[in-house]
Every structure is written in structure tokens, then in C-alpha cells.
């Protein structure tokens, strides 16, 4: 590739990896570039990579690496860096997700609303997110392919693998959630096991304080319906050698340090300081910054409790850990015999005895196990002694074996706690495994880890290549000749038999005399010509392998020791004989063939190879998804991006390998619209009159003489380097055009300057001639003027002398006249002031006199009226006592008294028990109130005393002031007496001193008074609060008394001769139902409870006799007419719902509202609920909203309370009190005079009105929710402009030969049509405008929320052209709102504030000139800084190519967002939907117009019923009196 001057490139730099540069000079074999670090560098062309010249136009970053113009290392690196600076931590590379650890909390990305947004969304449709990958795996497993899936999470220590795994499991539980046993989900149980696994499997390394030293594969199992049915955890390659050997500054496993810091538990196991144990003191790092070992110990114990490990097993686990530590402190010295050993000293013997005690085994057997081994032969058992080194190795082998078995036991128990589904056929596995490792010193663990990563990389390469093939197939292009990049040769080098590195290592381990030198020699001899294996220069045993991520040098010093995993028979026999069931359970008895040999060799590498093989088989049977976690810096700080470290991780994570696979095929893919929009300037003649983008693309490529490109169905595929050729040609054309424009512009500027200079010279000449002429004329005019001036000066001097004389005379006269006038005016003013004072004083006297007379008159009138009222009250009482009705009732009650004795006795008992409990409560309240009242009285008395003192001091101060005034006046009057004057001065000084003392006392008194008043206010507040509680109790008590009064009336009016046996039970049920005892079941929110749920029904025998006397019960058999009215659509007459009017007329005629007990209201409510539950309920919702609201309006206006439910308190208690209060004053809501009769409402009627109100709210809520469901698909389409619209707008903006086409608003027209249809439906059903206004307002609020949230979640929507498209759609909604008027639309336009301001921000020009204050206050006042920051980070100008908000504003917003993130618990930038009911009962009463039901006739379909013939005989039925 040739480079020209001015071309933007990437140049490699040691510290930064890659830096931006610009070509300054291009030579034959070298290129001189000027880097962003202001350095001139001369490099060869092969070391340069092209950079996109338009990288800043799209916001400087893309959310998918495949969208990069140049897919190369620096492009990937800097794209991640720019997105990380904007807190965009997720980025796609095809189907691979790259997650950069933010090292800060971002809760808005992981709340439940965000999970709901990504549910069921195709991968890549929304912004990159780990939830998108999890949803893709779930959708393919459960919906599309019915095939198990796997998610591979990899990265180095501290990159966020574990947190990402938690988020994946959290999302999978959300979409396939199952409530597991003990009220814990599977995800919770797996996460609760994390602290336990971290304690026993994590340790501090050089790079990470909490590094996982094992691999983990979590398999979540699903049933056929997609619900989670179980889970399992598998672990790989625990770093056992860390138990016995660590290096500084690393640590051993966390559990050892936690146990040593456990306090009493540590003393119980005879543990001391960490530094006293050999397995822990090999490193000087004992504590972790920000971590308390003791606290972590108790967290681990709590995790064991959660997982289900018993207390006995917990004690055994920690005893085993303590025994391992004591085991490490056992030291050996040479014994008496050759090659033998024994315990060194008493300290070692103490640790030996302690370890044996903790293992619960024989100490002598432990000594013999450590210092010797037995060999079984035909002749017998031969015991061979071990030397010191062998005994220490035997000790370490025992410690590693015990710890490994303990770890496996923990994993097994965790799996048992979670629960596995063996019948599950669909699984989603989440692999959290260590990433590629390359340190200064790399040992056997790094070799195994990198071997596993090579295996996974091969699987990854195959998957990426497969994805490439699938895209090529979908685009129908030829791809058969593309080569596949494979790393099979590295895998053969490591694992191939019989001469692979692992095979050679196992062979060396089987020979006791083999060393790492013999192993290295044999390896170099077998692989001397292998391209991937190298021998290091300065070591005979170290070797280097060229992995996919780079070269790694391994030190073989400890390869053999770490690979040997002997199963020592003595170890198994020792611990299987332990008296502790837990320890003996870890070591089962060995088979016969194992007993014959003391050492049974087992290769760690071979076993890991088999585990890895099983894992790869599992992964191959699933469809993989990849998440690559990246650690941006080694300091674990937010907003710090280290290029070199990230680049190394990208290479190790296989991301750049995926880039290389893409480069092997067609790395550059562009849609035809994007390609034509970018490169149409190369062949402008093709743009004239042509709209076939594919043909234009082909013409451009053929014109540029490019080969090996492919034209797919929707995209053009270019080989590596071809896009650079096109960009160079495009840059040349644009440069030529720029030079041409500059030349024309310079010509224009030069001519303009020439014309301006010529006009200036002409102006200067004219000005000079004018100056000369004006100078000559001025001389002549001055000569003539001198004569005239002299004449006028002489005249002026004479005139001035005359005027001075006249002015002097006038001044003397005016002074004299003024003096006379002022003296006269002073006399008049004094006289007038005296008159005003006299008149004011007389008026004041008469006003005071009048007020006294008026108060006396009012008092007399009040007394007289009170006297008259008392007389009238006595008359009324006497008349009431003499009423015959009372005497008749008294006679009837006396006759029935004997029959009701038993029932009343029971009622008294129930009543007495309830009153007793209430009286006790009231007495308690009264005592509290009395005590507080006493305190209040004491405080008031104290305040009064202070106030009296204050008045006394004030009076003394006034007296002192009067004395001072008098003394001062005497001083003035007796100025001649000097001695008296001095005495008065002394007296004044003493009085002033006394005055100051009194003022100080007054200030102190005021302060104490203020304190007392504050305390008094606090006491009064408490007293008021208690008084309110007492009022509430009194209200409840009064309501219960009223209800009891109703029940008592019923009891008095019922014959009981034949029902005494069942009366006690019935009354108890009725009483419990009336006062709301716990027996009654709570109702759901949207159910409409019937009145009989509150009034318990009486026995059939009682109700039969009662029915014969109440009018409503005589008509109860005719409730079918009401059911017919409800089930049929009776339509409307003159805008009035016929069904509601007919139902109200029937209930009014049958006196249902005056009945104390009836079931007819139950039938009405239940019938309405049944209609709303039917199959056609959605279509009838507007009809029933109109009918129920009309019926509720009639009840509200025509029912009144009979005074039964009035309470003595000012405030009504509960819902019943509110209804009673409403019914007591129905005229409050009526704007006209009461022409309709008011009916006295009883308790069932009041409850019926309450249930009808709930029914109206239910219908409104169902209708609103249905509308939201219907409009949601339309909104999902409207948020983004159609592809054809975007392509045409782009071509119109950059191609001169093509005119712009108007944007298609068909999707928005669908929304307008939907709203028109909704308005027509609501108007056809005569729904009140109040409901229409509330419904439309909430619907537009939902539109605002959906459009705004979609805008923030989809980057392709945050463009200039898309903003214009959405703005045009919003203008259609504005026109619709204007057309329907405010009566129906209300504040709907205001509800669209968020989306209007966001779209307005997208389409403004010159965004870089806007400050943060202008954006917050002028452009987006309703939006939060987090929302504005989200829009700015996603915005890009796809139409004009302009830049977005300035970097200073973005940095300021990022700082504010980070600061808010630390303070807020939930700081999502998305909006929440409003599901509340936006009106109350009072709103309905005031908003719904009154209805005259008199002129509504009975429909013909109902006229044959006999029970409604009265509706045909009378037009306006009146209730019978």
C-alpha cells in the first residue's frame, strides 16, 4: 500500500502500543510520520496501519468491531478506549461480547427494567450488553433450535469474570425463573455458594487479590417449558501445590488466614499467628487491604449454613484445615539408620500430636506414615524408611491430598444443596475459567492453564469461522477458498501421544530417578525441529512455546513434582481409620491391587487433559457464546485505560485472533446504502437518475478496477486493503475539490480587496477636495462674522446691565412677598392640625363607644336566641315523648322481649367482651393523655410564670424610662442649678446601669421563655398526635356501634320462635363479619366485592319470614331482568346509557336502596364482573365504562345518608366514613337545583356504590392496559426511520444530482389512525370526556416512555436523520392533539416532554458550541444529566458528518454521573411506566355531568317482563313513601 502526505495512520509505539499519526513525507522504502505525541518517526511502510479519516463523525466509536472501516489491532484498541471513556463497557465483535471492567458501580445497567428491555430482542438490535448474550443463548435453547447452549467467560484475574457470570445467571433466572426450595432461586443458591468456593479456592496473586485458582463450569438445567429445573457446578484444576508452596507477595488460600484470625475458634484448634506456620509464612503478605480476615471467617460460616452444611461438618472442616497447618510445621532430622528420619524436636512433636488429635487418628501411625512406606510382596510386607527430604515430600503430599479431597467434598455438597435435574435435556452452561497467563516465571500451573486456553481457542476459532460462513451463506457469496486459521500443531505438541509434552512428562514421572533435566533433554531431542517449541538461550531446562497469544517461557524446575499425584496407601489407611466420620468419609478404602503398592502414581496433567476433553465434548454438543472480559488497568481504578495491558489481553483472549480470521476472508462489510453514501463521489455520473444501490456499488468498484470483491444480498464484501484504496482515491478527489474551492475562494477574496481599495482611493480624493473648498469658504465667513460679532457684543453688554438692575428689583420684591406668604401659611397649617387632632380624637371616642354597644347587643341577642332555642328543644322533647309511635314500638318490644332474651344475652356477651377490650385500650390512652396533659399544664404554667416575670421586668423598664425622661426634662428646666444638675447626672448614670441590668435580665428571660415555648409546642404536638389517635379509635368505635345498631334493629324485627337453636351461631358470624375479624379473606385489587361479603346472611328460615315484609325481597325473584340488561347491549338514547338508567329505575322502584338487607346488589356486581371476564370483554370495555360511570353518577347525586353513619369526629373513619360523608351532602357536587328526589340510603346501598366505584376503576385499568399492548408494536417500528428513508436522505445530502425525497411517515400514520379509531370508539359509546382525557393522557405518557427508552437503548436511533424522522412523527401527534381539542387531549402534549426534548437535542446544529448549562436549562430541562450523557455518548451525525458535544462538556457530565453513581441506590436513565388510576371518587362526582333518566324508555326486548311493567305506566317513577 502506498502512503501519501496527509494520510492518517497508526504507528506502533512501545509504551502505548499504537498511537495516532499523520504522514509527513513518503519515501521509497520509508515513511516519515508525525505522531500525536508530537514526534517525527521514520518507519517502514509495513509497520503502518491505515486509520479511518472520518472516525470522529460517528461519535468516534462503533458498538460492533465489524463496523470499523479498518479492522485492525489499533482500530479495535482505540474503539474500546473511546467507549470506555463514555462508560460504554460492552462492545461486540460479531457475536463475541467484550466486557471492560469499569471498577465502579453501574446499577442502571443491571436493574430489572433493563432485563425486561433485552428480553426476546435479537442480538445486536440494542446496545451491547451481557444480557443480550444471555438472552440469545436462552432464546436459541428454548425457542429456536431446542439445543443446549454454553457461554464461555474468560479473561485475566480482575477482569470481572465472576461478576459477569453472576449477571448471566441473574438474567437466566429472570427469564426462566423458578422459585426453588426454601424460597431461594437457583441463581441465589449458586451465588450464595460463591463466598464458600472463594474462601477455599481463591488466593492472592501478583495481579489480583482475589484470584480464582480453579476453573468453574455452572450448568443451569431447564425443563421442556423453559423453566429452570436444576443446576450443577463443576470445577477444574485446583492449584493444589499452593497449599504447601507459595512465593512472596502471594498468599495461600483465604480459608487458612480466616481460620487463624477467628479468635476463640483458632484457640480451640491451637492455632497461633500466621507467621508461625510454615505453609503461610513463606510470604510476607498476611493481610489484604480493605479485608478483615475475622469478618470473612464469619461470612464463610454463614455461607456454609446457607448451603446446608451441618455444624458438625463445619467443625470437622475447620479441624481439617487446622490439622493441615500443624502438619506443615512438622520437621524431620536424620535417624539412627541410614536414609531414615525422625521428628526433629519437641515443637515438631507438639504439632504432630495436635495434627493427630485434629485428624482423630493414632499419632504413632501418623509418624510411621510420614517417615516410612510399606511394600507388599509375596513373602510379606517390607517397611522402608524415608530420608528427611522424602519424609517432607510425603508430608506435603498428604497435606495436598487432604485439601483436594476437602474441596471436592464442598463442591459435591453444594451441588446437592442446589439440586440437579437428571431428566433435563436442555442446559445452558456458563464457563468461568482462567485466562491465558504469561508471567516472568511460568511453572506447571501456567502450562496447564495455557493448554486449556489453546483448546478453548481452537473451539473459538472454529466458532468464529462458522459464524463467518453463516454470514457468507446468508448473503449468498462464494467463500469456499477462504483458509481457516488453526492451532492444532500446538495442541499436538502438548497432548499428542506418544511423544507429546504431557506424555513425556508422565513418562519421566514414572521413573523415580528422573529429573527435570532429563525431561527437558528428552523433550528437546524429540521436538528439535518443531516450529512452535524453542530452547531458551541462558537455560538448559527452560523451553518456550509459541501460543496463539504469544510466546511463553516455562521453567521446568518443579514440573515433575507438581505433576506427580501419588495415591499413597498409607495416607488412605491412616485417614480412613480416623474416628471422625467426616475425615474417614473423605478417604474410602483402596482396592486390593492398590494395597500391594505403597505409591499409586497418578498424573495431574493427564487427569486435567481428560477433564478438559470432557469439557470440550460438552462444549461441542452445545452452541457457544463468548464473553471476553478485559481489565483496563492494573491499579483497579475507574476511567484509567492502559493501552499496552489491554492490547495484551486482547491477544490472549483471542479477540485479535478473531480479527485475523475475519481478515482472512472479507473483513470489510458495508450495506449498499452506507457504501454509496461514502464513495459516491468517486463516480458521480452513476448517481444521476439511479436508485439501484447494488448496481451503483458494482459500478463504483468496477470503475476503481478492484477485484475479488463480493456482492451479497444486502452488503458488499471487500478484501483486506481494498477499503484503504477506495479511501485514498476518495481523499484525493476530496483534496482536489478542496483545492479547487480554495482557489475560487482566494480569487473572490482578492477581487473583493481590489474593489474595496479602489472605492477607498476615490473616497479619499473627494474628501481632500472638499477639505480645501471648506477651508477657503471658512476664511471668508470668518471675516464677515467678525463685524457682526462686534455689533452684537456691544448690544449684549448694554442689555446685560439693564437686565441686572431689573432682576435685583424683582428679587427684593419676591423675598418680601414670600416672607409674608410663609407666615400666613404657618398660621393656617397650625389651625388645620389642631382641627384634625380634635376630629380624630372625637371619632375614636365614638368608635369605642359603638363597639362596646355592638358587643353588648350581640351578647344579648345570643342569650335571647339561646333561650328561645332551649324552649323549642324542650317542646320537641315533650312532643317526642308523647308520640304514639314510640308507645306502639314499646308495646311490641315488650311482647317480643321474652323471645329475644337468649339472643340478646349472647349479643351482650359478645358486645361486653369487645367493649371491655376497647375500654381497656381507651383507659390506657386516657392515662397517657392525662399524663401528657399534666405535663402540658405544667409547661403552660411555667410559661405563664415566665411571661409574668417578663411583664414585671418590662414594667420596671418602662418606669425607669419614665424616670429618665422626667430627669432629663428637669435637667433642661433647671440648667441654672449646677449642684442639682450634677446630682441628676449621677442619678441618670445609676438608672442607666440599672436599665442595662434589667435589659440583660429581659434577654435571658426571653431566651428561657422561647425554650419553654418550644418545649410546650413539642408537648402540644405529642398531645395532638395522641388526640388524633384517640379520635380515630372513637371513629372506629362509633362505626362499630352504628353497625351493631343495624344488627340490633334486625334482631328486634325478626321473629325467633322457631329459630332459637341457630340464632347464636348466626349472630356470631354476623358480628365477626361486621367488625372485620381475621376470618374474612382479603380481596384482590381489581375484584369488586359484593355487599353480602360484609353483611353475613341470616339462616334460610329467618330470611323467609323477613322477605315477606320487605318490598325489595318481594321483587328479588325478578332479578333476571337486571341480568338481561347487563348481558345485552341496549345502546344509548340521546347520549344516555339505556342499561344504566333501566337498572337504576328498577332498583329505585323496588326500594333496594332503602332496604337494610338485600342480595340484589350482589347479582348486579357479579353479572358485570362476568361480562368483563368473557371472551368479548375487550370490545365491550368502552360500553361498560360509560354505563358504570353513569350508574355511579346517578347513585352519587340521588342517594343520601339517613344519619346512621354520622360520627362525632370531624374526620370520617375509613372508606365507610367517606361514603357516608359524601352521601350526607350530595348537593355539593351538583351544579343545579335538586329536581330529582333524594333517597335515604341504607348500608347495602352504600357498599354497592363503593363496589361500583371499584368496578369503574377496574374497567378503566383494563382498557388502558389493552391500549398499551396494541400500540407497543407500532411504537417499536416508529422509533427508527426505515432503511430506505435513511439511504435517500444520505444521498440527497451528498449528491448534487439527486433530489431529496420526503421521509415516509406511514408508521406514524398508523399511530394516528389508531388514535382516531380509539376516539371514534369512545365517542360512539358516549364515554364522558373526563375518562377520555385521562385515558389519552396516560396513553401519551406511555408513548413518551416507550420512545424515550428505545432511543436510549439503540445507538442507531441517536442520529441526526433519525431525529428528524421522529420529530416529523411527533408533529403529526401534535396536530392530532390540536384537532381533538383540550377537552379530550388535556395535557397529552406535555406528557411527551422527554422524547420531544431528546429529539430536539438530536436535530440542533452546532452542538459543540453548546455549554452544559444551555443544554440543561434551555434544550433539555426535563432530562437528567445521566440521560443527557447517555444521548451524547450514543449520538452521531449520519447526514452532515458534524461533530457532537465538545469533550469538555462530556467530561463534566461524566464527572457528575460518576459522583451521582456513588450516592444513588438506583440510578437508571430509563423511565418507569405509570400504572396508577389517575382519579378518585370525588373527581368522578365533580367531573361527570348529571343524567336525567326520566325520559329513557324501556326497550322492546324487555317489555314482556311483568316485573318492569311499571316502567311502561310511568315516565318518572317516584319512590313509594
From Swiss-Prot:
Signal peptide range: none
Tissue expression summary: High expression in kernels and stems, intermediate in ears and leaves, and low in roots, silks and tassels.
Chain coiled-coil ranges: 870-910, 974-1050
UniProt domain Myosin N-terminal SH3-like: residue ranges: 4-53
PROSITE patterns for this protein: DILUTE, IQ, MYOSIN_MOTOR, SH3_LIKE
Residue intervals of the Myosin motor domain: 60-731
Locations listed in the record: Cytoplasm
Domain Dilute: start-end pairs: 1162-1459
Region Actin-binding, annotated ranges: 493-527, 529-552, 587-612, 612-634
Annotated keywords: Actin-binding, ATP-binding, Calmodulin-binding, Coiled coil, Cytoplasm, Motor protein, Myosin, Nucleotide-binding, Repeat
One Gene Ontology term of the molecular function aspect: ATP binding
GO biological process: actin filament organization; actin filament-based movement
One Pfam family it belongs to: Myosin_head
Residues annotated as domain IQ: 733-755, 756-778, 781-803, 804-826, 829-851, 852-874
Deletion consequences: Dilated endoplasmic reticulum, small and misshapen protein bodies, and opaque endosperm.
SMART domains: DIL, IQ, MYSc
InterPro entries, sorted: Dilute_dom, IQ_motif_EF-hand-BS, Kinesin_motor_dom_sf, Myosin_head_motor_dom-like, Myosin_N, MyosinXI_CBD, MYSc_Myo11, P-loop_NTPase
Binding site for ATP: 155-162, 208-216
Gene Ontology cellular component terms for the protein in this record: actin cytoskeleton; cytoplasm; membrane; myosin complex
Domain remark text: IQ domain mediates interaction with calmodulin. The tail domain is a globular cargo-binding domain.
Biological function: Myosin XI motor protein required for endoplasmic reticulum motility and protein body formation. May function by binding with its tail domain to receptor proteins on membranes and exerting force with its N-terminal motor domain against actin filaments, thereby transporting its cargo along polarized actin cables.
PANTHER family: MYOSIN (PTHR13140), MYOSIN-15 (PTHR13140:SF781)
Quaternary organization: Interacts (via C-terminus) with HIP (via C-terminus), but not with zeins, FL1 or intrinsic proteins of protein bodies.
Similarity-based family: Belongs to the TRAFAC class myosin-kinesin ATPase superfamily. Myosin family. Plant myosin class XI subfamily.
Name of the protein in its database record: Protein OPAQUE1
Gene behind the chain: O1
Amino acid at each position: 500500500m502506498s502512503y501519501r502526505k496527509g494520510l492518517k495512520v497508526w504507528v506502533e509505539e512501545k509504551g502505548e502500543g499504537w498511537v495516532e499519526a499523520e504522514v509527513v513525507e513518503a519515501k521509497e522504502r520509508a515513511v516519515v510520520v508525525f505522531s500525536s505525541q508530537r514526534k517525527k518517526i521514520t518507519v517502514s511502510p509495513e509497520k503502518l496501519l491505515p486509520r479511518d479519516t472520518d472516525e470522529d463523525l460517528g461519535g468516534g466509536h462503533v458498538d460492533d468491531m465489524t463496523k470499523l472501516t479498518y479492522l485492525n489491532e489499533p482500530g479495535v484498541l482505540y474503539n474500546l478506549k473511546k467507549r470506555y471513556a463514555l462508560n460504554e463497557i460492552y462492545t461486540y465483535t460479531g457475536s463475541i461480547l467484550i466486557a471492560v471492567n469499569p471498577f465502579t458501580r453501574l446499577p442502571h445497567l443491571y436493574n430489572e427494567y433493563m432485563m425486561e428491555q433485552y428480553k426476546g430482542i435479537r442480538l445486536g438490535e440494542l446496545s451491547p450488553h451481557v444480557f443480550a448474550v444471555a438472552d440469545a443463548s436462552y432464546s436459541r435453547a428454548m425457542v429456536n433450535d431446542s439445543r443446549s447452549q454454553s457461554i464461555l467467560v474468560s479473561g485475566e484475574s480482575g477482569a470481572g469474570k465472576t461478576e459477569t457470570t453472576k449477571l448471566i445467571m441473574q438474567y437466566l433466572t429472570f427469564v426462566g425463573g423458578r422459585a426453588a426450595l426454601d424460597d431461594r432461586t437457583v441463581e441465589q443458591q449458586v451465588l450464595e455458594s460463591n463466598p464458600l468456593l472463594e474462601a477455599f479456592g481463591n488466593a492472592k496473586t501478583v495481579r489480583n487479590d482475589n484470584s480464582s485458582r480453579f476453573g468453574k463450569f455452572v450448568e443451569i438445567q431447564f425443563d421442556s417449558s423453559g423453566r429452570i429445573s436444576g443446576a450443577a457446578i463443576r470445577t477444574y484444576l485446583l492449584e493444589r501445590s499452593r497449599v504447601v508452596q507459595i512465593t512472596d507477595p502471594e498468599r495461600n488460600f483465604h480459608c487458612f488466614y480466616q481460620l487463624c484470625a477467628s479468635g476463640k475458634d483458632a484457640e480451640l484448634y491451637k492455632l497461633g499467628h500466621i507467621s508461625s506456620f510454615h505453609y503461610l509464612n513463606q510470604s510476607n503478605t498476611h493481610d489484604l487491604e480493605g479485608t478483615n480476615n475475622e469478618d470473612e471467617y464469619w461470612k464463610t460460616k454463614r455461607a456454609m449454613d446457607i448451603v446446608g452444611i451441618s455444624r458438625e461438618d463445619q467443625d470437622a472442616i475447620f479441624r481439617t484445615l487446622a490439622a493441615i497447618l500443624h502438619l506443615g510445621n512438622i520437621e524431620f532430622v536424620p535417624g539412627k539408620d541410614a536414609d531414615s528420619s525422625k521428628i526433629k524436636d519437641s515443637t515438631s512433636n507438639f504439632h504432630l500430636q495436635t495434627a493427630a488429635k485434629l485428624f482423630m487418628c493414632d499419632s504413632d501411625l501418623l509418624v510411621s506414615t510420614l517417615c516410612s512406606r510399606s511394600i507388599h510382596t509375596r513373602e510379606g510386607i517390607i517397611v522402608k524408611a524415608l530420608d528427611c527430604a522424602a519424609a517432607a515430600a510425603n508430608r506435603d503430599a498428604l497435606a495436598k491430598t487432604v485439601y483436594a479431597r476437602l474441596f471436592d467434598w464442598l463442591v459435591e455438597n453444594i451441588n446437592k444443596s442446589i439440586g440437579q435435574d437428571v431428566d433435563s435435556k436442555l442446559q445452558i452452561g456458563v464457563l468461568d475459567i482462567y485466562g491465558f497467563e504469561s508471567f516472568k516465571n511460568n511453572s506447571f500451573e501456567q502450562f496447564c492453564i495455557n493448554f486449556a486456553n489453546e483448546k478453548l481457542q481452537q473451539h473459538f476459532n472454529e466458532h468464529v469461522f462458522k459464524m463467518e460462513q453463516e454470514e457468507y451463506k446468508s448473503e449468498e457469496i462464494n467463500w469456499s477458498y477462504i483458509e481457516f486459521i488453526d492451532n492444532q500443531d500446538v495442541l499436538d505438541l502438548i497432548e499428542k501421544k506418544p511423544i507429546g509434552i504431557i506424555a513425556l512428562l508422565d513418562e519421566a514421572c514414572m521413573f523415580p530417578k528422573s529429573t527435570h533435566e532429563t525431561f527437558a533433554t528428552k523433550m528437546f531431542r524429540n521436538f528439535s525441529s518443531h516450529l512452535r517449541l524453542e530452547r531458551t538461550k541462558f537455560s538448559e531446562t527452560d523451553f518456550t512455546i509459541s501460543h496463539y497469544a504469544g510466546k511463553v517461557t516455562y521453567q521446568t524446575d518443579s514440573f515433575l513434582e507438581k505433576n506427580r499425584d501419588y495415591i499413597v496407601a498409607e495416607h488412605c489407611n491412616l485417614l480412613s481409620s480416623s474416628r471422625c466420620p467426616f475425615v474417614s468419609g473423605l478417604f474410602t478404602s483402596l482396592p486390593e491391587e492398590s494395597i500391594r503398592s505403597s505409591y499409586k502414581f497418578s498424573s495431574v496433567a493427564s487427569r486435567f487433559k481428560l477433564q478438559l476433553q470432557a469439557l470440550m465434548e460438552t462444549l461441542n454438543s452445545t452452541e457457544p457464546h463468548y464473553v471476553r472480559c478485559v481489565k483496563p488497568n492494573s491499579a483497579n481504578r475507574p476511567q484509567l485505560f492502559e493501552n499496552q495491558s489491554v492490547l495484551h489481553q486482547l491477544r490472549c483472549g483471542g479477540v485479535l485472533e478473531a480479527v485475523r480470521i475475519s481478515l482472512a476472508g472479507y473483513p470489510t462489510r458495508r450495506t449498499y446504502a452506507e457504501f454509496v453514501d461514502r464513495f459516491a463521489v468517486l463516480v458521480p455520473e452513476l448517481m444521476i437518475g439511479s436508485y439501484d444501490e447494488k448496481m451503483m456499488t458494482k459500478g463504483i468498484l468496477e470503475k476503481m478496477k478492484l477485484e475479488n470483491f463480493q456482492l451479497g444480498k444486502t452488503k458488499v464484501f471487500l478484501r483486506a486493503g481494498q477499503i484503504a484504496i477506495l479511501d485514498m482515491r476518495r481523499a484525493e478527489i476530496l483534496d482536489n475539490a478542496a483545492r479547487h474551492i480554495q482557489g475560487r475562494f482566494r480569487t473572490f477574496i482578492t477581487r473583493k480587496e481590489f474593489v474595496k481599495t479602489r472605492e477607498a482611493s476615490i473616497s479619499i480624493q473627494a474628501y481632500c477636495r472638499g477639505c480645501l473648498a471648506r477651508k477657503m469658504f471658512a476664511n471668508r465667513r470668518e471675516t464677515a462674522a467678525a463685524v457682526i460679532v462686534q455689533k452684537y457684543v456691544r448690544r449684549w453688554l448694554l442689555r446685560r446691565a439693564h437686565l441686572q438692575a431689573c432682576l435685583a428689583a424683582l428679587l427684593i420684591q419676591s423675598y418680601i412677598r414670600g416672607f409674608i406668604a410663609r407666615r400666613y401659611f404657618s398660621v393656617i397649617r397650625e389651625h388645620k392640625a389642631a382641627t384634625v387632632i380634635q376630629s380624630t380624637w372625637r371619632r375614636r371616642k365614638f368608635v369605642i363607644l359603638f363597639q362596646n354597644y355592638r358587643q353588648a347587643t350581640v351578647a344579648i341577642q345570643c342569650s335571647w336566641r339561646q333561650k328561645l332555642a332551649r324552649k323549642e328543644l324542650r317542646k320537641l322533647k315533650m312532643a317526642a315523648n308523647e308520640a304514639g309511635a314510640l308507645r306502639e314500638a314499646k308495646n311490641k318490644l315488650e311482647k317480643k322481649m321474652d323471645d329475644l332474651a337468649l339472643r340478646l344475652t349472647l349479643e351482650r356477651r359478645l358486645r361486653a367482651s369487645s367493649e371491655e377490650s376497647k375500654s381497656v385500650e381507651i383507659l390506657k390512652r386516657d392515662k397517657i393523655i392525662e399524663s401528657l396533659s399534666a405535663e402540658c399544664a405544667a409547661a403552660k404554667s411555667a410559661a405563664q410564670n415566665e411571661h409574668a416575670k417578663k411583664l414585671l421586668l418590662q414594667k420596671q423598664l418602662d418606669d425607669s424610662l419614665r424616670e429618665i425622661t422626667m430627669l432629663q426634662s428637669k435637667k433642661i428646666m433647671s440648667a441654672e442649678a449646677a449642684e442639682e444638675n450634677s446630682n441628676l447626672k449621677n442619678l441618670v448614670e445609676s438608672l442607666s446601669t440599672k436599665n442595662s441590668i434589667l435589659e440583660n435580665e429581659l434577654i435571658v428571660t426571653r431566651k428561657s421563655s422561647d425554650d419553654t415555648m418550644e418545649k410546650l409546642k413539642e408537648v402540644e404536638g405529642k398531645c395532638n398526635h395522641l388526640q388524633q389517635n384517640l379520635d380515630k379509635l372513637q371513629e372506629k368505635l362509633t362505626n362499630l356501634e352504628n353497625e351493631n345498631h343495624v344488627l340490633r334493629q334486625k334482631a328486634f324485627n325478626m321473629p325467633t320462635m322457631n329459630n332459637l337453636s341457630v340464632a347464636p351461631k348466626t349472630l356470631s358470624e354476623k358480628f365477626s363479619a361486621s367488625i372485620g375479624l381475621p376470618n374474612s379473606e382479603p380481596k384482590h385489587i381489581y375484584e369488586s366485592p359484593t355487599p353480602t361479603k360484609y353483611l353475613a346472611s341470616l339462616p334460610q328460615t329467618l330470611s323467609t319470614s323477613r322477605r315477606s315484609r320487605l318490598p325489595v325481597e318481594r321483587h328479588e325473584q325478578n332479578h333476571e331482568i337486571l341480568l338481561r340488561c347487563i348481558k345485552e347491549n341496549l345502546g344509548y338514547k340521546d347520549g344516555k346509557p339505556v342499561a344504566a338508567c333501566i337498572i337504576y329505575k328498577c332498583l329505585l322502584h323496588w326500594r333496594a336502596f332503602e332496604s337494610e338487607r338485600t342480595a340484589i346488589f350482589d347479582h348486579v356486581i357479579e353479572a358485570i364482573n362476568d361480562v368483563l371476564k368473557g371472551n368479548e370483554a375487550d370490545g365491550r370495555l368502552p360500553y361498560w365504562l360509560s354505563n358504570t360511570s353513569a350508574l355511579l353518577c346517578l347513585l352519587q347525586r340521588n342517594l343520601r345518608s339517613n344519619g346512621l353513619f354520622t360520627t362525632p369526629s370531624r374526620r370520617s373513619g375509613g372508606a365507610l366514613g367517606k361514603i357516608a360523608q359524601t352521601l350526607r351532602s350530595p348537593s355539593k357536587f351538583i351544579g343545579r337545583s335538586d329536581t330529582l328526589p333524594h333517597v335515604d340510603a341504607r348500608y347495602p346501598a352504600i357498599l354497592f356504590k363503593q363496589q361500583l366505584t371499584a368496578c369503574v376503576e377496574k374497567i378503566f385499568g383494563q382498557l388502558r392496559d389493552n391500549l398499551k399492548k396494541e400500540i407497543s408494536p407500532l411504537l417499536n417500528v416508529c422509533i427508527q426511520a426505515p432503511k430506505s428513508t435513511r439511504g435517500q436522505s444520505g444521498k440527497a445530502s451528498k449528491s448534487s444530482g439527486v433530489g431529496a425525497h420526503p421521509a415516509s411517515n406511514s408508521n406514524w400514520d398508523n399511530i394516528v389512525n389508531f388514535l382516531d379509531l380509539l376516539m371514534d370508539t369512545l365517542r360512539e359509546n358516549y364515554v364522558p370526556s373526563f375518562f377520555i382525557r385521562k385515558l389519552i393522557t396516560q396513553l401519551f405518557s406511555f408513548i413518551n416512555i416507550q420512545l424515550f427508552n428505545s432511543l436510549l437503548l439503540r445507538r442507531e436511533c441517536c442520529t441526526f436523520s433519525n431525529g428528524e424522522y421522529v420529530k416529523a412523527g411527533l408533529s403529526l401527534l401534535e396536530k392530532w392533539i390540536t384537532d381533538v381539542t383540550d377537552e379530550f387531549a388535556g395535557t397529552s402534549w406535555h406528557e411527551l416532554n422527554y422524547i420531544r426534548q431528546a429529539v430536539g437535542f438530536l436535530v440542533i446544529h452546532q452542538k459543540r458550541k453548546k455549554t452544559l448549562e444551555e443544554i440543561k436549562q434551555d434544550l433539555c430541562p426535563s432530562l437528567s444529566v445521566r440521560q443527557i450523557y447517555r444521548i451524547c455518548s450514543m449520538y452521531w451525525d449520519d447526514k452532515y458528518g458534524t461533530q457532537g458535544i465538545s469533550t469538555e462538556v462530556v467530561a463534566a457530565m461524566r464527572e457528575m454521573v460518576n459522583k451521582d453513581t456513588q450516592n444513588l441506590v438506583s440510578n437508571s436513565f430509563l423511565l418507569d411506566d405509570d400504572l396508577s388510576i389517575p382519579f378518585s371518587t370525588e373527581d368522578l362526582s365533580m367531573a361527570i355531568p348529571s343524567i336525567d333518566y326520566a325520559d329513557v324508555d324501556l326497550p322492546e326486548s324487555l317489555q314482556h317482563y311483568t316485573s318492569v311493567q311499571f316502567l311502561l305506566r310511568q315516565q318518572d317513577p317516584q319512590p313509594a313513601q
